[in-house]
């Protein structure tokens, strides 16, 4: 049997969204505590209980920590960017928590991680959104990331 592996950075992105979701949901600003909770979940293999036996999951700890720290350092700017891209009929206070968490992490990686190409960021987070959000929200994630990438000359 061949062993399947999921990209370590992809898992780190999912874990970062989970950490930021936990931050919002629990109103917990202790970044180290949040990171430790999420890391222990993955390191104790709790994430693999519902997966096929031959599927191996591990995350890039450095990428995970970099994403979470960058979100915490830039949270006000990220929220301002998100809120500025909402249409007039959308109230930022009513944005679903998971959607806001995913947007914070994805926009953070898009703007503050120059080593990751914009198209990779857009594709990765659209895929993550596809697994976590409804159809309308998936389209919104794709659209907002594309607009932000264009506005910041990340793609043409």
UniProtKB/Swiss-Prot annotation:
GO terms for molecular function: RNA binding. Involved in transcription antitermination. Required for transcription of ribosomal RNA (rRNA) genes. Binds specifically to the boxA antiterminator sequence of the ribosomal RNA (rrn) operons. Belongs to the NusB family. GO terms for cellular component: cytosol. Pfam families: NusB. This is Transcription antitermination protein NusB. The keyword Disulfide bond does not apply. The keyword Transcription applies. InterPro entries: NusB-like_sf, NusB_fam, NusB_RsmB_TIM44. Keywords: RNA-binding, Transcription, Transcription antitermination, Transcription regulation. It comes from the Bacteria. GO terms for biological process: DNA-templated transcription termination; transcription antitermination.
